[in-house]
């Protein structure tokens, strides 16, 4: 019974190593970690200057 457990553990260890990969792990670039990306892709409002139109009450609506 212990030989089958040892064999199973050996293969599980090999599978785990393959999933992790060998060598040094490098940081993957993501847009959230780069502020220059956020500056370049920021949405710029190109509408009418000023704020939104004033709110109307129910009595002012047509």
Curated annotation (Swiss-Prot):
Domain of life: Eukaryota
Biased composition (Polar residues): 32-43
Spans annotated as Disordered: 1-62
Stretches with biased composition (Basic and acidic residues): 7-29
Protein name: Uncharacterized protein DDB_G0268226
Species for this entry: Dictyostelium discoideum (Social amoeba)
């Amino acid at each position: 019974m212990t030989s089958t457990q040892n064999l199973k553990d050996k293969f599980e260890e090999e599978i785990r190593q393959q999933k992790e990969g060998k060598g040094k792990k490098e940081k993957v670039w993501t847009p959230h970690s780069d502020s220059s990306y956020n500056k370049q892709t920021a949405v710029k409002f190109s509408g009418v200057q000023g704020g939104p139109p004033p709110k109307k009450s129910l009595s002012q609506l047509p």
